[in-house]
Amino acid sequence: MNNIPIKPKDAQWTDAQWKSIYANGQDVLVAAAAGSGKTAVLVERIIQKIIRDEIDVDKLLVVTFTNLSAREMKHRVDQRIQQASIEDPRNEHLKNQRIKIHQAQISTLHSFCLKIIQQHYDVIDLDPNFRTISDVENVLLLEQSIDEVLEKHYDTPDIEFLTLVEQLSSDRNDDNFRDLLKRFYNFSIANPSPFEWLDSLVEIYTDDNKHKLYLDELERLSKIYIKAAYHTLLEAENNFLNCIEAEKHLDVIKLEKFKCEKMIEGNVINFEEIINYTSEKLPTITKKLKDTNEDEGISSQFLTNAKDFFDDYKKLLSEVKNKYLMRSYEDLKVDMKRLAPRIQYLVQIVKDIINGFAEKKRSRNVLDFSDYEHFALQILTDQEGNASPIAKEYRSQFEEILVDEYQDTNQVQEAIISKIKRGDESNGNLFMVGDVKQSIYKFRQADPTLFMDKYHRFTKDGDQSGLRIDLSKNFRSRKEVLATTNYLFDHMMDEEVGEIEYDADARLYFGATKYSDKSMPLELHALIQDKSSDNDLEKSEQEARYIAEQVKYIIEHKQVYDMKSETYRQATFKDIVILERGLKNARNLQQVFKDYNIPFHVNSKEGYFEQTEVRLVLSFLRTVDNPLQDIYLVGLMRSVIYQFTEDELANIRVQSMNDDYFYQSILHYMKDQEANPLLVEKLEHFMDDINMYQEYSQSHPVYQLIDKFYNDHYVIQYFSGLIGGKGRRANLYGLFNKAVEFENSSFRGLYQFIRFIDELIERNKDFGEENVIGPNDNVVRMMTVHSSKGLEFPYVIYSELSKNFNKGDLRKPLILNQKYGLGIDYFDLEQNVTYPSLSSVVIKSITEKELISEEMRLMYVALTRAKEQLILIGTIDKEEALEKLERLPISGNQIALHKRLSADRPFDLIYSILAKYQSTSLLPEYRFEKSIDNLDESLRPTVDIKIAQFEELSIEDSESEQESRNISDLEVEGSHDDTLKQQINDQLSFKYPYLKDTEKPSKQSVSELKRQLETEESGTSYERVRQYRIGVSTYERPKFLRENKKRKANEIGTLMHTVMQHLPFKETRMTETELNDYINELIEKHIIEEDAKKDIQFEAVMNFIRSDLYMTITQADKVYRELPFVVNQARVDEMPESDEDVSIIQGMIDLIFLKDDQYYFVDYKTDAFNKRRGMTDEEVGIQLRDKYKIQMKYYKNTLETILNSKVYGYLYFFQFGQMSIEEDV
């Protein structure tokens, strides 16, 4: 390291940042904590290489994690070069950089690998016309490769193969086995040499020396729990020693101490002692014993605590015995030998899949992203495994290699970088920046140990190795955010769990000195679920309402400090983000926020396959493909499409309990003479549908099948009408588009498409709606913690902390680990017995530790997004659980290791640490520090713990009292809030050269057009989507949500339109009895719900039947109801058509009738209007005519345009009567 310039006194950089910018002459690792300005440092280093060292920009290789990061980095560098050129216009070097920036290699590693392949394809005998494989082809070719390999083995089955299939498959099929092989494939190709890694898996089972790797780890894990058990036993003893007449209890403790000490004598595990261990029975702690102690002034709590500690001790030893040491050392080693042939066979299957898949891709001349890396590595490596001549050319070309987000690098990427970097660590040209505490992509095979190995190897002075620089000053957050985050992770994270020691170097230090001294404590909300009978809300719904209350409070009472003006401003919606581990709660929040009139956005591209509308369509496709899948069949039947009730489904099943499949039960029920005839009719309709779709799928592509399903059942229209309709519609179109993409591949058929979708689900690959909001849109955002990485928000609400970690992989029969290999239980095919093997026990425990470590790092990412304040929310069932968390055992300065290794959810760790800090009554053995004075300032938290009973919260259904507003409503309602209107207009109007066209919607309903013209607002863009009117039952809230609630005006309006849509026109006029019978018929046919009857304005309908208009319609030649229309607005407005884009008007006419060659239309209105005292009917008529004048004009002109004939019309108000509009428009 040399030539670091002296930092000027007025430099904006910290000493560590300055050093990071100018250090050279050796490999440099910058450990950049959250908010420490790493991107600015990286850009400045690149700029100084160009300006100060006069290195051409295309002589630098800058590797970023995403394409977006690469574009932003290149843009920043380009701007700085331009700025430098303006300041020094005669500098020819800078002028050249303006040209070379476009060829600069600032990209993802995938993009760099692709360039290597494009330039050197001949080295690996690759056709230069290769293309990147599509998702569809990639998924299905891999599936096809697996099929062919398994088919070969099924044809000539080996005993080991049969054992594997039996062990790793379900009772019904081998889908689980296939899924496992796909995971195995993906794990393998994340290694630089997949075949070598696969061979190493077998060696662990065959080589006695390799067994020691597992045995050592088993012993280490066992020690953790035995030592924790012994410590817990000592606590029990200490509590008994404080009591009198507890000698018998102490005798048991003494005996247990002797046994426990024998288990780990000389710090070596005695397997026999543990396997043969049986616990002693502790004498009962009687009321008499408690009373005796109380009489002597000794709290009986000592006895209770002692008993609890002793129970915990027994539980810990039982866990060691049952989890790690069920069988002897020798038995475990024998099992490993027996498993070796099975592992050898499994490895060969995976090798065959790799080869088969590679051959299929090569024959089609396609590459996937893993091929980019492996082919590039192949080009850069000679036959001896050293750098090839091509790699050496790249070494000469690049003066420095800069890697961003180094903690997310995998083994293959590390191998590629090592081939093109110069020198070793002490004199190399590799600059790496990242933060292992933010390594959260293990599911993509990111390997944080690569970062940690260098972190430990490199030194702060760079002596004899690489240079390590810690950027620990945070310029983002208030002191309270940083100190509390430090305090949490100081007591939670270390190398054992978290994979880094959270020491003085890892901590966050306050750097945003412009913040005022206003106190903003971290708020931890423990929401105790109300399970009372009068509250049916689920835990997630309760939490969603609570979150909405917190948002309201922030908006009404909190401020944001503006660094530039050094003043406060009121908090706005865009200052708030809601972070959760996943997005399953998004729909709940969306509904609740709508009730609260809170603008809200969630990027539902994540969690796509979990969305209700997508699951419905997939259930439909799976049922059509194979109705013998009960979950999907029943799911489709219960859906809004077919609306079978749980009682109906139960009745079907009860009739034939012994059927293997629900489909068989349906067939049997339909033949049952005693079956409910209405249910049989409903089933016949359903089965006819399924048969029809099955037949249709045989001769039509999948996308046409989906389109038919959408159109037959108004699927798009229904989901468009729900909360988040735009996103739901985008999700449905996304699935349709995937089917179109599938059809363009070489694969065909519904079965293959479902396999493709299943693979996307397995890979957690989403393709839902795009993020359609900008950074300045004033909405509350919801996103996953993963999505929030790199972002910052004034207020962070980190919720769903009580959601359990996803430990599903730990329950699988085979577990993979890059370092420790493959863990599989031993399965005896003849005896049909499974029991844990040495490998499965060890790898399961290691994988659980790695999983919790990554979850801990996700917590760190979430907490470090906040600038002003953190609000943490968790929900628990009982308040007693909080007391247990407060008393979690500690070891040294941290939560006891065994508790962290077995943690189930973030809330347990966070609450325990903060509650211990705040408690004034906690015993010393549960506390981390005796006094706050003992704490370093960077660790001194500011915390406000709030425990709330849900029943105490206000959960009024604001939906019944509040109405959402749009910009068009503001002026109609008489609002003079011009600032608000302008703000909304500014957000909705995207400025670009063709602004006039963008402010004119491509398609509008007549109602929308009416509001637009009434308010003279133009600039709201409506998405172009087909819309159809459907029955009220699909739009109504579920029955359980409507109980004891009045329908809203718009719901009653829809209900009345449905009644009128089917109303018979009889020349003799309907009687009240006939009308009542007609309404009952609508209920029986499920057109309206039974509870809707009370909201039908019965007398108003009768008044219509008694009217002249009713009789006029009965005498008409033709009657058309609910007629949709779409028409060019220019033609309706009688404007000359031009080449410019036109606007389309769409709408629905309630009724049209033809009489004496003259067309008339009728529009029903259920409006309630205030008739002021003294108003005449004529004045009311004038008011109503004016209100609907524009809408009726467009109805009339539209129909005249379509029919090419004069059209007259009527408005019919249920509260006023008919009104001719033939002369008024």
From Swiss-Prot:
What molecular functions are annotated in GO for this chain?
3'-5' DNA helicase activity; 3'-5' exonuclease activity; ATP binding; ATP hydrolysis activity; double-stranded DNA binding
Catalysed reaction, written as an equation = Couples ATP hydrolysis with the unwinding of duplex DNA by translocating in the 3'-5' direction; ATP + H2O = ADP + phosphate + H(+)
Q: Where is the composition biased (Basic and acidic residues)?
A: 999-1014
Q: Which UniProt keywords apply?
A: ATP-binding, DNA damage, DNA repair, DNA-binding, Exonuclease, Helicase, Hydrolase, Isomerase, Nuclease, Nucleotide-binding
Q: Where does ATP bind?
A: A32, A33, A34, G35, S36, G37, K38, T39
Bridged cysteine pairs (disulfide): none
Q: Which EC number applies?
A: 3.1.-.-, 5.6.2.4
Checking Gene3D superfamilies in the record gives: 3.90.320.10, P-loop containing nucleotide triphosphate hydrolases, PCRA, domain 4
One Pfam match: PDDEXK_1
Cofactors, names only: Mg(2+)
- Which residues does the UniProt record annotate as the domain UvrD-like helicase ATP-binding? 11-478
Q: Name one GO biological process term.
A: double-strand break repair via homologous recombination
The residues the entry assigns to the signal sequence are: none
Gene Ontology cellular-component annotations: cytosol; DNA helicase complex
What residue stretches are annotated with the UvrD-like helicase C-terminal domain?
479-790
Subunit details for this protein? Heterodimer of AddA and AddB/RexB.
Q: What does this protein do?
A: The heterodimer acts as both an ATP-dependent DNA helicase and an ATP-dependent, dual-direction single-stranded exonuclease. Recognizes the chi site generating a DNA molecule suitable for the initiation of homologous recombination. The AddA nuclease domain is required for chi fragment generation; this subunit has the helicase and 3' -> 5' nuclease activities.
Family according to the record: Belongs to the helicase family. AddA subfamily.
Q: What is this protein called?
A: ATP-dependent helicase/nuclease subunit A
Q: Which organism is it from?
A: Staphylococcus haemolyticus (strain JCSC1435)
